[in-house]
Amino acid sequence: MAFGDLLEKVGSAGPFQLLCVLLLTAPALLIASHNLVQNFSAISPEHQCRPPPPGTNASWVGNSTAAPGGLSLAPSPERCCRLAGTHGQRPRRNGSLGREGETEPCRDGWYYDCSTFSSTIVTEWDLVCDLGPLPALAQMLFMAGVLLGALLFGVFSDRFGRRVILLCSLLLVAVMGTGAALSSDFLTYCAFRLLSGVGLSGFLLNYICLSLEWVPTKSRALVVTWLSYCSTAGQVVLAGLAYSIRDWRWLQLAISTPFFIFFLCVWWIPESARWLIVNHRPATALSNLQRVARINQKQLGGDSISLEMVEKVGGSLPEKSTCSCLGLFHTPAMRRISCCLMSVSFSTNLAYFGLSMDLPAFGLDIFLVQTFFGAIDILAKMACTLALSYFGRRAIQASSLILAGVFLLGNIPVPREMLMVRLALVVLGKGCLAASSVCSCLYGGELFPTAVRQTGTGFTTVMARLGGMVAPAVLVAGQQFPFLPLVIFGVAPVVSGIAACFLPEMHNVPLLDTIEEVEDRARRKGEETPARETVAHVVHSTRI
């Protein structure tokens, strides 16, 4: 008897499974809010030096632009210096003055344009001028927390269980996200953001895993697709929340405090019976299965399961793999698969988060841009899901990356005045990157053999998190070299798309179990299409 037989006895697609997925849908909708909240909470508004005490600088009198709260912003191009003299002469663009005055740093702080947001971390802690890169540092630390969480909670989940780690992750996001909203200084804020990233990563690793282990094989694709679309739709949810809440502290609270409720709701979901059986806890597994049977109104089926049956299923489940990570690079075929997939994961996340974190660069309403980004991601994922069944994995993976790079590189020569053209190219590029992420998740799971599947997936996940960490640094460099972000975000997907052409096709191909089988497949001449033919096919597809 297999575990699937036990699940059928207690109900594999009943009210319990529906409630389980619905309870995990709500927190999934706020994943994007935590990833991208700094698009709004760390926005840098127009700003200008505060003047010296009254009577010492006449240059702030007259011909000024009114700001909320009775403040006045003089229309000067200078943001990080002010006149030191009293003769009313404005600094030139190069920072120098005429004979009548000199410039000095903004010693009394800044005035900010609060017409869009009443408060951000930038306006509260004066993160402008020399401190301008610090918001990007906070985002990098958050992504570092996501990476750290992936390294820690993957191991902890296998050792302590899906449910325990999921609950701890939800509580960590709730507490640390709330702490970030109540932070009194920037360093404290960064620390809370890093730890909330750790918690969010733990949730990401376990919420799909726990739900999948309670549903039958035939329903797994549907569950994964639904939860994936919910997390993508969270970008639109974030736009709505940010539009309604213009103070960064209240916005941070709005996306964090619901996780206390999610923690209480998810407490109802029992531990995965499959995990309990694998870890030699058949009695608890039996209790959970019978509880599911009661909820699904399959009491007779639950009562028919005995402890001996559960123990017998435990003996039939596969043992944990003892292959080390060196198996990913030990043979030529595995090296090619591992390196290509790591490149794909890194470049996809690098460009995806780089575009997602740079909303003000488009010169349009940031709430509208965020909504467009969320909508195109949903459409792209739907299109990719359908295309994978007809055109295969390799062509879709390579085409989506190369097209993304072409759209982004094509944006470079477009004049800045053509805002809608620039936005359209970026939205299309981001949609291709969303399709690439869907394809890589499926493709990676199929390419790695069972012996190293979890290890290989873990390595590609780490590379994806590294890409997300590097993206804010590229945007900071773009402040000095404006063309650099689009060049990097465009070239990286093209290079990875070409690398994807060297991967074997897995459409309608049985999954392999050992590294030796992977090498045997690579040696069989008829199994692989030459890479140059795949490149030609991809180029033809992009032209179409």
Question: What are the roles of these predicted feature ranges?
Answer:
Residues 43-101, 105-108, 215, 222, ...:
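Central mid-sequence intracellular linker of multi-pass
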Residues 125, 183-186, 190-229, 240:
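Cytoplasmic helix-loop-helix junction between adjacent transmembrane helices
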Residues 32, 36, 193, 207, ...:
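C-terminal transmembrane bundle
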Residues 164-178, 187, 228-229, 396-410:
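Structural signature of the two symmetry-related core transmembrane helices
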Residues 2-17, 71-133, 294-357, 361, ...:
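Flexible cytoplasmic loops linking transmembrane helices in multi-pass membrane transporters
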Residues 134, 168, 219-226, 452-459:
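Cytoplasmic loop-to-transmembrane helix junctions
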Residues 161, 182-187, 199, 245, ...:
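Helix-breaking motifs and short loop linkers at transmembrane-helix boundaries and internal kinks
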